[in-house]
Structure formats: C-alpha cells, structure tokens
Amino acid sequence: MRITLIGPGIMPIPPTGWGAVEILVWDTKLALEKLGHQVQIINTKDAKQIINDINSFRPDFVHVHYDEFIPIVPYIQYPCAITSHFGYLERPQMFNGYINVANEFVRVKPNIFCLSRGIQKIYNVMFDIPRDNTYVTPNGVNIDEFNYVDDPEYPDRSIYLAKIDYRKRQHLFQSIDSLWYAGNLADDRFNTSKNYLGEWSKDRLYNELTEYGNLVLLSDGEAHPLVCMEALAAGLGVVVCEWGKANLDTEKEFITVIPEDKINDIEYVEQEIVKNREYSIKHRDEIREYSKKFDWVEVLKKYYLPSIEKVIAKHGS
C-alpha cells in the first residue's frame, strides 16, 4: 500500500530531541516500510501544500496525526483517518480552548484512529461520532532502539521522563528523594537544583533509560503515552496516573496505577514507587518480554493495517 502520514509541522520528523508525535510518525513509517509499504511523510502547517503533496503521491490511505488539521480532512479525496494526541481527551472538563477543535470533530465526523478504548468512548458518546467511524489503534514502540541491561547502574532511582510542565505535575513529587527528572523545562514551579538531569536527546533516551529502576508518569491527563512503552522496552516497570494506564495490563506487578484521589498523598505515592521499583529490578526479563506486544510491527499487523483496510473498504462502498 501507499500510505501518507501527516505530522503537525511544528518540529522536524524524525525529531532531534523532544517530540513524541514526531517519533511516533517516524517509527510508524519505519515499521510500515519493513512490512513492504510505501510511505510519504508530510510535515507542514500549509494546508494547500498538504493537499497538493497528497494528490501528487496518490496514496491508498492518509493518516492525519494532528487534530488541529481537522478542517482539512473533508478536502482529502483518499481514504483517510485522523488521530488526536491531546492529553485531556478523557477529561472533557479540562478542554478549555480545545472545545473549538472538538466542535470541528462533531461537524466533520471523520474516521478516527483512537489511541485507546476510553478515548473511543469519548468520541462515540460525547462527540456523537458513530462507532463505525472510530477504530482503536494503540501506539507502538521501536523496541530494537532501546539498550537493555539486566543490572542497571541506578537500581535505587526512579525516573520521571517527560516535558516538565503543568500537565505532568513533576513539582508535586520533588520531596521524593529517589525520584529523578529528565525533560525540557516549561514549569517555573519546578526546582531544577534537585535531581534534575536536563533534557535528554533521543540517543541518551535509547542508551540510558535502562539504567534506572522504574518510570514514573503522574500527569493529570494522558492519551496512551509513548514513554510508558519506551520504559517497558528498556526493562523498567511503570508507575502511572489513571489516564496513563491505557492499553496496559494493570494486573502485572510491574505496572502500578496511582488513583487520582491519592495523588497528593506523597507518602503513599513514594511507597508505591519504591514497591514497584523493587519488584521491577528483579523481573527485568519479564518486563522486556511483555514490551514485545507493543513492538510497532506487531501493533501494525494487529490493529493498524486491519483498521486501514476497513476505512478503504468503507470509502469504496
């Protein structure tokens, strides 16, 4: 198949540093090519150029990875779906200005590739988008990129790897001595003098993540965060917020969910982080094996390509 992937046009693809959507688009391209498909990436904010580039390529399918491009979707003449990576999709009370984008989704009623069943339900119930227009297509991870060791250099450290901002809430947990932070800084409440590792490059992420005991992600909103799968691929257990558990098997002892009503109980949070870390460093092979279900090639074969085929079939009917 000939497949067009449309990025936000904000950062380069592949990204040189931060950029979860950009690395998702790039890794999707690599995995699709591994399976024999031809892939075009369009990464510009210019709507006319997007349409012209699509028409020049004449794809079998177009996947838009930026929800603010929803007004363009009706002008795409090929089978098409759009994915939102907005972190508050499952928390409509946090939409604020996003309501304008949401209203466009209600108007256009596009095909939507949803990152989780919870997000699919929001589109079906709140947005009144027909179930037949929504498809669950989880994110994957390029497992082979990640260094993996059985004995990490910092088994007594947990890492909070994310952009340091208001949604991620890192500043709340800085009294936890064993918790370290990596990410670009966008929150003046965060104290950079304590356990701050700076912003990591992609190479550092791939090479050094495995040296920590486990990953912590306690945001007040998420949409199937890539960093959780990256951590699993590196052999780390994960401690996540309620919205970070999408597509994870929460019965696994190396996956811990902190209820939102306990998020300010720092003593409880610390105990759960330490408990998860102590289990995780002894069961790295189990974690690494579990991560293989999120390998991009497996995700594409199980979810993504069957969903594309359904959209194409519907387009022709």
Write out the residue ranges for each language-model feature.
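A short, active-site helix/loop in glycosyltransferases that binds the activated sugar's phosphate group
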Residues: 106-133, 141
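A charged, aromatic-enriched C-terminal amphipathic alpha-helix characteristic of glycosyltransferases
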Residues: 260-268, 274-315
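Membrane-proximal helix-turn-helix segments that form the acceptor-binding/catalytic region
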Residues: 88, 93-112
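Acidic anion/phosphate-binding donor-loop and adjacent secondary structure
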Residues: 92-93, 124-125, 138-156
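Short beta-strand->alpha-helix junction loop in the catalytic core
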Residues: 118-119, 136-146, 185-187
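Conserved donor-binding/catalytic core segment of Leloir-type glycosyltransferases
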Residues: 113, 150-180
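Aromatic "clamp/platform" in nucleotide-sugar-dependent glycosyltransferases that forms part
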Residues: 220
